[in-house]
Every structure is written in structure tokens, then in C-alpha cells.
Curated annotation (Swiss-Prot):
<feature type="transmembrane region" description="Helical">
    <location>
        <begin position="96"/>
        <end position="116"/>
    </location>
</feature>
<feature type="transmembrane region" description="Helical">
    <location>
        <begin position="278"/>
        <end position="298"/>
    </location>
</feature>
<keyword id="KW-0472">Membrane</keyword>
<keyword id="KW-0874">Quinone</keyword>
<keyword id="KW-0520">NAD</keyword>
<dbReference type="Pfam" id="PF00146">
    <property type="entry name" value="NADHdh"/>
</dbReference>
<feature type="transmembrane region" description="Helical">
    <location>
        <begin position="202"/>
        <end position="222"/>
    </location>
</feature>
<feature type="transmembrane region" description="Helical">
    <location>
        <begin position="29"/>
        <end position="49"/>
    </location>
</feature>
<feature type="transmembrane region" description="Helical">
    <location>
        <begin position="238"/>
        <end position="257"/>
    </location>
</feature>
<keyword id="KW-1133">Transmembrane helix</keyword>
<feature type="transmembrane region" description="Helical">
    <location>
        <begin position="339"/>
        <end position="359"/>
    </location>
</feature>
<comment type="function">
    <text>NDH-1 shuttles electrons from NADH, via FMN and iron-sulfur (Fe-S) centers, to quinones in the respiratory chain. The immediate electron acceptor for the enzyme in this species is believed to be ubiquinone. Couples the redox reaction to proton translocation (for every two electrons transferred, four hydrogen ions are translocated across the cytoplasmic membrane), and thus conserves the redox energy in a proton gradient. This subunit may bind ubiquinone.</text>
</comment>
<dbReference type="GO" id="GO:0003954">
    <property type="term" value="F:NADH dehydrogenase activity"/>
</dbReference>
<dbReference type="InterPro" id="IPR001694">
    <property type="entry name" value="NADH_UbQ_OxRdtase_su1/FPO"/>
</dbReference>
<feature type="transmembrane region" description="Helical">
    <location>
        <begin position="299"/>
        <end position="319"/>
    </location>
</feature>
<keyword id="KW-0830">Ubiquinone</keyword>
<keyword id="KW-0997">Cell inner membrane</keyword>
């Protein structure tokens, strides 16, 4: 299946290169659109799936009218885009508009180094992991700026909570990825996936030797995206909507889009770092060439990556419907007193496992 897709892309690539420098620029723009447009569409369907799944968990139907509810998210988008963006009279006008853009830009920029397959990646950067850490850290500046520019007590309190929470869990996430870097011997995301390849299927994935780091990264990813049960940044019962309390229309839609794009991104990264990315869980167990349409089941391919992402994206919704919101002090305690010490210890354990050959770096 991967070969079929590449056979369609390569002739198009060569045609653009034949146009000279302008063709190179157009090809770069096209690649950006090939990432941005699917992410935006995925967010729309993700919102529908969230409403549907939570409805089932609440013993309700969820969205069910007008195309089984599929078009509800698109209707919400058009509704928000055509609404007026109201600004408080005492707000900082320029910063008020810049803040949602500053939140959205890193959420989309991070996708440039995410590999969907061995050859399907926008930029196969050798410092992809470091680039991701940098991009995912920048989004909080938009939230802080929104809280300050709104000139609202609720917005400012939400922004301060977000700053403390993101900084706290960014450390734990970074330490967890240090373990992945040690196990794979690379900071290139494609090489991290190749390091999990082998003839033992899912037993070669980093999930097993790095299981504590997987749990830390998963929970920290939920906290990093300000989702339940770590959504004190926009806790409705306390500070209404936090940093977004004064936003409406298209500006609010940008915050919403950035949040859900980050949720999908974290789901991709968990799948790549700990679940073998596009690798098949039965890779090496079956050796047969039948048809490109089904060979990916045991050879691996982007459909496996999407299935893993779907599971973790659905887990976000499960968390929201199942767990009560943590208190702010409980969130800080979990990050600083549990996750950070645990990751430091397991980094040392990972180094020992690599030194003694317990973790093999691919085939």
C-alpha cells in the first residue's frame, strides 16, 4: 500500500522540480498543505467522535442527525468563523489577536518532523525529537499572552496555572524522551521507529523495557494539553474558561483547533516512541508477498500507525468522561514528586539495559 501511494507522489514531485525554483517553493507549500489540511479535518471528525463516545458512556445517543452528526463539527466551525471577535475595552488589542495565532503556529509546525511511514515525512530532520520538544513548549506562550492581554482576573489566573503546569510536566516528558533516545541511539523520529524493528513483533517495541516512561509520557501528554483530569487551566467551576474566557468567534476557534491538534500530535508521538510507529505487531512472524493491499498487515505501514493513534486519541475522551478534575496542588505534586524522580531512576535503568544488551537497537 505504501508503494502505491509513493508511486502517485513521485511523478508529481518530479513535475514540480521541473518548474525550477518556483516549482520547489510550490512543492514545499503543497507539502505543508498536505499536513495542515488533514490535521484540520481530523480535528473536526475528532470532535464528532468525542461527542459520540461521551454520549455512549453517558448512555445517550450523542450527535445523530444530519449525516449521523458528522457535519455538526463543520457547522460549529462556520458558526465561529462568522461570529464577531469581541475585545474587552481594557484589553491589549494587538496581543489579544496575536495570542491565539502564537498558540496555533507551534501546534502545526511540530507536524513537519512526524513520520507517517518510512518515506512519508515532510522533513526527516536528524534533530526531530529536540525540535518537537521546542515546538510543544512554545504553545504555552500564547496561553500566557492571552491571559495577560485579556486584562481579566479569570484569564490571568488560568494563564498562570497553565504556565506552571506545562513547565512542570515538560520536564517529565523531556526526561521520558531521554530514555527513548538512549534506547534508540538517535533523536531522528524515523530512526527511533527503526530501532524498534525486529522479528519478534511487538516484543521489540520500547513499550516493554520503557513501560514506566511510557506511563509518564502518556499522563504528562494529557497534562500538557490541559485536558481532563488536568484541565484546571480552564476549570469551568472555578475560572469559567481560563485564558479563553474573553475570546469568541474565530479567535476562540484557533485555541480550540490548537488544543485538539496537540492531542492528536501527542497520540502520534506515543505511538512512534513506544509502540513502534508504523511497524506491525506481528512483524517477523509472517513472511509472505500476497498483495500490496494486505501485506502491510505483517510488514507494517501507515494504517498501523493510524490505528494506534486512534486508540490513544480515544483514550483522551475516556479520561474526560471517567475521572474527576484534580486539584491544582495534586497536579503539581504528581509532576514534581512522582514523575520526575521516576523518570530519573528509569533513565539509569535504561542505560544499564542498553549497556548489557537487554535492549537491542533494531535489525
Amino acid at each position: 500500500m505504501n508503494e502505491l501511494l509513493l508511486n502517485l507522489v513521485d511523478p508529481l514531485h518530479q513535475w514540480f522540480l521541473g518548474l525550477g525554483d518556483g516549482g520547489v517553493v510550490l512543492w514545499s507549500v503543497l507539502k505543508i498543505l498536505l499536513i495542515a489540511v488533514p490535521v484540520i479535518v481530523s480535528v473536526a471528525f475528532y470532535v464528532v467522535w468525542e461527542r459520540k463516545l461521551i454520549g455512549w458512556m453517558h448512555v445517550r445517543h450523542g450527535p445523530m442527525y444530519v449525516g449521523m452528526g458528522i457535519f455538526q463539527a463543520f457547522a460549529d466551525v462556520f458558526k465561529l468563523l462568522f461570529k464577531e471577535i469581541l475585545q474587552p475595552s481594557s484589553s491589549h488589542k494587538a496581543m489579544f489577536i496575536i495570542a491565539p495565532l502564537l498558540t496555533l503556529a507551534p501546534a502545526f509546525a511540530a507536524w513537519s518532523v512526524v513520520p507517517f511511514d518510512a518515506k512519508l515525512v515532510l522533513s526527516n530532520a536528524n534533530v526531530g525529537l529536540l525540535y518537537l520538544l521546542a515546538m510543544t513548549s512554545l504553545g504555552v506562550y500564547g496561553i500566557i499572552l492571552a491571559g495577560w492581554a485579556s486584562n481579566s482576573k479569570y484569564a490571568f489566573l488560568g494563564a498562570m496555572r497553565s504556565a506552571a503546569q506545562v513547565v512542570s510536566y515538560e520536564i517529565a516528558m523531556g526526561f521520558a524522551l531521554v530514555g527513548v533516545m538512549i534506547a534508540s541511539g538517535s533523536v531522528n523520529l524515523s530512526q527511533i521507529v527503526f530501532a524498534q524493528a525486529g522479528n519478534s513483533g511487538f516484543f521489540d517495541w520500547f513499550l516493554i523495557p520503557l513501560f514506566p516512561l511510557f506511563i509518564v509520557y502518556w499522563v504528562s501528554g494529557v497534562a500538557e494539553t490541559n485536558r481532563a483530569p488536568f484541565d484546571v487551566v480552564e476549570g469551568e467551576s472555578e475560572i469559567v474558561a481560563g485564558h479563553m474566557v474573553e475570546y469568541s468567534g474565530g479567535a476562540f476557534a484557533l485555541f480550540f483547533l490548537a488544543e485538539y491538534a496537540n492531542m492528536i500530535l501527542v497520540s502520534f508521538l506515543i505511538s512512534i516512541f513506544f509502540f513502534g510507529g508504523w511497524l506491525s505487531p506481528i512483524q517477523g512472524w509472517v513472511n509472505a508477498d500476497i498483495s500490496p493491499w494486505i501485506d502491510w498487515l505483517w510488514k507494517g505501514g501507515w494504517p498501523w500507525l493510524l490505528m494506534k493513534v486512534f486508540f490513544f486519541a480515544s483514550a483522551y475522551i475516556w479520561f474526560r468522561a471517567s475521572f474527576p478534575r484534580y486539584r491544582y496542588d495534586q497536579i503539581m505534586r504528581l509532576g514534581w514528586k512522582v514523575f520526575i524522580p521516576l523518570t530519573i531512576v528509569w533513565i539509569a535503568v535504561t542505560a544499564l539495559m542498553v549497556f548489557y544488551g537487554v535492549i537491542q537497537k533494531g535489525v
